[in-house]
Amino acid sequence: MAKKNAIQDFSGEIGIAALVVAVVALMVLPLPTMLIDALLGLNITLSVVLLMVTMYIPSATSLSAFPSLLLFTTLLRLSLNIASTKSILLHADAGHIIESFGKLVVGGNLVVGLVVFLIITTVQFIVIAKGSERVAEVGARFTLDAMPGKQMSIDADLRAGHLSPEEARKRRALLAMESQLHGGMDGAMKFVKGDAIAGLVITLVNILAGIVIGITYHNMTAGEAANRFAVLSIGDAMVSQIPSLLISVAAGVMITRVSDEEQAHKQSSLGMEIVRQLSTSARAMFTASALLMGFALVPGFPSFLFVALATLIFVFGYTLRNRAKEGDGDEGDALPALLREGSKGKAPTIAEQAPSFTVPVGVRLGAELAKGLDVPALDTAFQQGRHALAEALGLPFPGIAIWKADALQPDSYEVRVHDIPGEPVAVPDGHLLIPDLPEALRAQAVEAAGLPNHPAPHWIAPAHVAQDAALSATGQRVERVIADHVVHVLRRSAHLFVGLQETQWMLERVTTDYPGLVAEAQKAVPAQRIADVLRRLLEEQVPIRNMRAILESLVVWGPKEKDTLMLVEYVRGDLGRQIAHQATGGTRQMPAILLDLSVEQTVRQAIKPTPAGNFLTLDPQQVEAIIMRLRGIMQGNPVETPSALAIVTSMDIRRYVRRMIEPHLQALNVYSFQELGGYVDLRPVGKLVL
C-alpha cells in the first residue's frame, strides 16, 4: 500500500510538472496541427472529468485542490488559444478539431456562427462566471466570520467530552481546509471570469487579423479571407469556450454545494441530494401535475405532451406519498422514550440481538412476549415513567435498550443493569397484573415473581377483571408492567447512572440560567468530584433537581472540605429543607431512633483514614448487637411504612451508620441533626444503647 501511494504521489508530481512545461511550450514553440488536435482533445477531457468529479464528491472539502486545478486548466486553455492562433494566422490551418467545430457551428452561415459564439460567451461570462464569483465571495466572507465560533464549539465539545482529542484535531484541520478552500475559490473565480473575456477578445482579434493577413499575404479576396479565417477563428473559440463553460459549471457546482453532515458521511453525490430533496413533498408533485393539466387545456398547446407530463408527475407524487406512509409505519415501531437524555440519535426499536457494548439498562424479551407487545403503548408507558423519574429525582434518563433473547422463556422478560441480570418475570399470555390482589381472588390468579415494586402482585385473566370495577381500574397490561419495573430499578439504582458525562450535561443545562454559578462551581470543585457528590446524594434517594442549591453549596464548602464524604454532608445540610419535607411528607413529624453518646463515640473511633478514603472498622459482633437492638426498637414501635421511622445522629458519623445498617435494614433511613435542623419535630421512640 505504501509503495502504491508513493507511485501515485510521484506520478502526480510528474504530471503537474509536465503540464507547466507544456503550458510554457505552447506559448513559445510552433506546434504541428496533429499535436494541437491532441491537446485540444485533452483539454475537453479534463473539463468533462472535472465536471463529473465535482458532481459526485460528498462535500466541497473533498476536492480542496480545485482552485489550483482552475488555475492550471485556465492557463492550458489560454496557451492552446495562443498556439492555435499562431497556426491559424501563419498557415490558415489549425487541425481537424478546430475546422470541424467551425463548420458545425457556422453551418454555412457566418452570422449564425458569430451569434452562437456570442450567446455561449455571454451565458458563461454574465450568468455562470458572474454568479459563481459572487457566491464564492460571499461564501469566503461568511466562512471567515464563522471560523471563531466553530473553533470555540470544537473546544467546548472537547472539554465536555463529546469529542476525543483526535476527533478535535481532525475537525480543526477540516475547518482550516474549508476556510482555505473558500478563500482560494474566491480568487480562482477571477480566472474563470477573465478566461471568458480573453476568449472573446482573442476571437475578435483572430477574425480581424485573419482577414488582413488573408488579403495581404495569401492574395485572397475579402470574402474568401473572411470565410476562411472566420470559420477557423469561431471553431477555435468554440473549442476553447465549451471546456471553459464546463469548468465554469464545475466551479459553480463546487461553491454552491451544501451538504449536511449526515449525507456527507453517506458519501452522497449531487444527483442523489437533488433527488432526495426534491422528493420530500408529494403535495408539490400533485400541484405541479394539476398546473400541467391546465397547460394542456390552453388552445394551441400540444395537449398530448402536457397530459403525458402531468400523468408522469402525478404517478411520481403518488409513489412518494406511499413511501412516506410506509416510513410512518416503520416509525410506529420506534421507541423515542428509550433515548438517553440529550441524545439526538435515532429512536431505538426492539432489536433482534443484544447491543455490541454494555448499556446502562437493558430489557431482554422472550420471543412470544416480544411478538405480542403493543409498541406505541410501551413507548407511552416509558414516556410517563421517565417524566416521573425526572420529577422525583432529577436523574438524567440513561437510555434503555430492548432486545429479543431466545435464551429466555418465550413468555418472560428480564431487566439488566450494566449487564447484571435481575430475576426473570414470567407473563402469562393475555393476563393483566393486579399490584395488590385481594385474598379472595388469589385462587383464580397466578403469583407474579420478580416484581420488587409491588407488595403482592398477581396475574389474572381479563375475564375475571371485567367482573370487578375496582380490579379493572388497577389492572395493568404487560407494557405498563415492564415500564414500571424498569423505572423502579432506575429509582433504586439511580446513583449507578450518573457519571462524568451526565454531570457535564446537567452543568450545560444549568449554564443556560446560571452561567456564573456554574463557572464558580467548576473552579471550586472538579467535574469528577461534582459527579461523586451527585452519586452519593442519589444513593440515598436525595433528589438532585435543585442544582442551583447544590452548586452554591459546593462553591462554599468545596475549597474548605477535601473529604468527599463530609462535603456531601455539608451539601445535605444546605438541602435540609428539601430532605426534611421528603422524609416527613410535609407533616414535620418524624418518629426517630436516637443513638446514645457512647454508641456515637464508638462509631467515631472506629472510622479509620486510609489513602483510598475513610472506612468504618467496627467489630462484627458490635455491628450485630447494634442491628439486634435496632430491630427490637422497630418491633416495639410499629409504623405504617418502614421508611417513616429513621435514625437521627451527628453529621460526622451519619454516613458510616447508614453504611453499617444498610445490608440489614435497607428501609431504615439515617439523618443528621444538622440537616433536619428546625424543619422537623422529632418524636424519639427509642435510644440505642450498647
From Swiss-Prot:
Name of this protein? Hypersensitivity response secretion protein HrcV
Tell me where on the tree of life, at the top rank, the source sits: Bacteria
Gene Ontology cellular component terms for the protein in this record: plasma membrane
NCBIfam families named among the record's database cross-references:
hrcV
Family matches, as InterPro entries: FHIPEP_1 (IPR042194), FHIPEP_3 (IPR042193), FHIPEP_4 (IPR042196), FHIPEP_CS (IPR025505), T3SS_FHIPEP (IPR001712), T3SS_HrcV (IPR006302)
> What Gene3D superfamilies does the record point to?
FHIPEP family, domain 1 (3.40.30.60), FHIPEP family, domain 3 (1.10.8.540), FHIPEP family, domain 4 (3.40.50.12790)
Would I find Transmembrane helix among this entry's keywords? yes
Q: Give the residue spans that cross the bilayer.
A: 14-36, 48-72, 104-128, 196-216, 229-253, 291-315
Which species is this record about? Ralstonia nicotianae (strain ATCC BAA-1114 / GMI1000)
Return one Gene Ontology term, BP aspect. protein secretion
Question: Which key words are in the record?
Answer: Cell inner membrane, Cell membrane, Hypersensitive response elicitation, Membrane, Plasmid, Protein transport, Transmembrane, Transmembrane helix, Transport
* Alphabetized PROSITE patterns for the sequence: FHIPEP
Q: Which gene encodes it?
A: hrcV
Tell where it localizes.
Answer: Cell inner membrane
Its biological purpose is as follows: Involved in the secretion of PopA, a proteinaceous elicitor of the hypersensitivity response in plants.
Extract the PANTHER family matched here.
Answer: FLAGELLAR EXPORT PROTEIN, MEMBRANE FLHA SUBUNIT-RELATED, INVASION PROTEIN INVA
- In what way does this protein cross or attach to the membrane? Multi-pass membrane protein
* A Pfam entry, by short name: FHIPEP
User: Which family is this protein grouped under?
Assistant: Belongs to the FHIPEP (flagella/HR/invasion proteins export pore) family.
